[in-house]
Amino acid sequence: SSTDAATLASLFSRPARGRAVPAWSLAADEAVVTALGNDVGFELIFSRQVIAHSRPMDIAIALSTSGNSDDLIVALTEAKKRGLLTIGFAGHSGGSMSTSTDVDYCFTIHSQSIHRIQESHARVGYRLWSVVQEQTQQRVADLMAAGPTNPGGSS
């Protein structure tokens, strides 16, 4: 799931086409992950990064093949507390991720096959990216059609 998170973050932040959207995987920096794990506990490695980096209007996405990864559940709880939109990608029956009130949307892949779950998470992630790109393009087109605005109000 860590590799899938890095791939999804890369798709948003460095797309082959379309607009880049700021995104990063909280598992990508081994030094931060191991320092937090050793100093405060591995169940807090992602929530501490949410505290440090999140801003209002951000989106937190967590990927877990079981849906029961404590470190991700704690991070999603922290993200929700901070006002972020929270999205879970889970497998099997969805685990605690699918029933948590701190998860706004949970995409559950009902399979016992880890590789099928991860393949499906990749497809759902790509579709999510596609929707963001479509909406962004439409918003830009709408703004362009509206023409320039006059913020000062004078003619």
Predicted segments — roles?
Residues 140-155:
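A short, charged, Gly/Pro-tolerant segment at domain boundaries
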Residues 1-143:
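Glycine-rich phosphate-binding loops that contact phosphosugars or nucleotide phosphates
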